Structure formats: structure tokens, C-alpha cells
From Swiss-Prot:
Co-factor binding details: Binds 1 FMN per subunit.
Residues where FMN binds: S10, S16, Q17, S18, M96, Y97, N98, F99, S140, R141, G142, G143
Origin species: Yersinia pestis
Enzyme Commission number(s): 1.6.5.-, 1.7.1.17
Entry function: Quinone reductase that provides resistance to thiol-specific stress caused by electrophilic quinones.
SUPFAM superfamilies: Flavoproteins (SSF52218)
Similarity comment text for this entry: Belongs to the azoreductase type 1 family.
Pfam families in alphabetical order: Flavodoxin_2
Top-level taxon of the source organism: Bacteria
Keywords of the record: Flavoprotein, FMN, NAD, Oxidoreductase
A GO molecular-function annotation: oxidoreductase activity, acting on NAD(P)H as acceptor
Keyword Transcription (UniProt): no
Protein name as annotated: FMN-dependent NADH:quinone oxidoreductase
Length: 201
């Protein structure tokens, strides 16, 4: 039995193309892998706090007593990392907002990037500690950006996930959704076709 973590990050709730792909993934995965356990975390509905000067002190051990707010942040970070480590397949619904990922997803990454916990520094350079995972990225975009300099989402996600140890990463794209209903419908249908193949693989 595999455990699957689905992370949603769109601010558009049920109107979101990436959230619709995430829901489709869950349906397809449950049908193909009935015994697997799926956890869905909506980072927009349950937002992660923005890392600031106070909260960063909670994630970097210094021996100083933590404030109540820092204690809450550290407990949340521990919870998120434990959840990440406990799952085998990590599905990230990552729409493109202004050429990059949503703030909600960046806040999540800031809360799980902890030296000595999800990565460590060695004489040979940084080493990721979140290993043995498969990541599937569902990314929707208003325009056409795949394989162009305007796509900052793919290289960033590959870099960050690889940094913490997740190197098995595949992408499913839904592009051109702002070009009109017909284009959006086709983009969603094409993405679902590919996603069904990914689930079956």
C-alpha cells in the first residue's frame, strides 16, 4: 500500500484548473489503487504563515527560548515534515501566478526547508533527506510557457524538490487556459488524459 499526499495551492477553490486536476488525480488514483491512503492538504484553505524575522528563529535552533508564536510555527513545521516523510507519492497542484508558484506554496516550502531535518550540508555539498519519493506536479497556466524562458515554475520546483531529496519528478501541464473557453477545455482534457496515463504507469 502506498501513501499519497496531494497539495493544493490555488486561491481559486473549485474554479481552479489545477485544483480540478488534483481532484481528477484523486479519483483516478483511488480507482486504480483502491487500498492506498490519500491525504489532501489545501494550502489556500489552510494557509501556512509567512516566514518572517520572528518565525525564522523557530526553524534555526539557537538555544534561545521560543515565543508562543515560534512554538506554533515549529510544531507546524514538524507536522508538515512528518506528513511529507510519511507519504510515498507527493502530488503538487502548482498553478502559475505571475510566472511563478503561488505564495501559498512558497510558504509551505519555507516551512519544510530545515537544515538537519529535510536537508543537510556535507563536505560534498548539500544533501537532501526526503528520499524515496515520487513527485507529480500539476501545473496550470493562462498562457503558453512550457520550455520557454518565461516558465520559472518547472526549474524552481525541480531545484527545490531535488534540494530536499526528491529527484523523481514529472509534470502535467494545462496551458493556454486564458485564451478562451475552447482552449481551456481542450487543455484540461489533454492534461487529464496524460494524468490518467501517469496514474496507470
Amino acid at each position: 500500500m502506498s501513501k499519497v499526499l496531494v497539495l493544493k495551492s490555488s486561491i481559486l477553490a473549485t474554479s481552479s484548473q489545477s485544483n480540478q486536476l488534483a481532484d481528477f488525480f484523486v479519483e483516478q488514483w483511488q480507482a486504480a489503487h483502491a487500498g492506498d491512503q490519500i491525504t489532501v492538504r489545501d494550502l489556500a484553505a489552510q494557509p501556512i504563515p509567512v516566514l518572517d524575522g520572528e518565525l525564522v528563529g523557530a526553524l534555526r535552533p539557537s538555544g534561545t527560548a521560543l515565543t508562543p508564536r515560534q512554538q506554533e510555527a515549529l510544531a507546524l513545521s514538524d507536522e508538515l515534515i512528518a506528513e511529507l516523510q510519511a507519504n510515498d507519492v507527493i502530488v503538487i497542484a502548482a498553478p502559475m501566478y505571475n510566472f511563478n508558484i503561488p505564495t501559498q506554496l512558497k510558504n509551505y516550502f519555507d516551512m519544510i526547508a530545515r537544515a538537519g531535518v529535510t536537508f543537510r550540508y556535507t563536505e560534498k555539498g548539500p544533501e537532501g533527506l526526503v528520499t524515496g519519493k515520487r513527485a507529480i506536479i500539476l501545473t496550470s497556466r493562462g498562457g503558453i510557457h512550457k520550455d520557454t524562458p518565461t516558465d520559472l515554475v518547472v526549474p524552481y520546483l525541480r531545484l527545490f524538490l531535488g534540494f530536499i531529496g526528491i529527484t523523481d519528478v514529472e509534470f502535467v501541464f494545462a496551458e493556454g487556459i486564458a485564451y478562451g473557453p475552447e482552449v481551456a477545455t481542450k487543455a484540461q482534457a489533454d492534461a487529464k488524459t496524460l494524468l490518467a496515463q501517469v496514474v496507470a504507469a
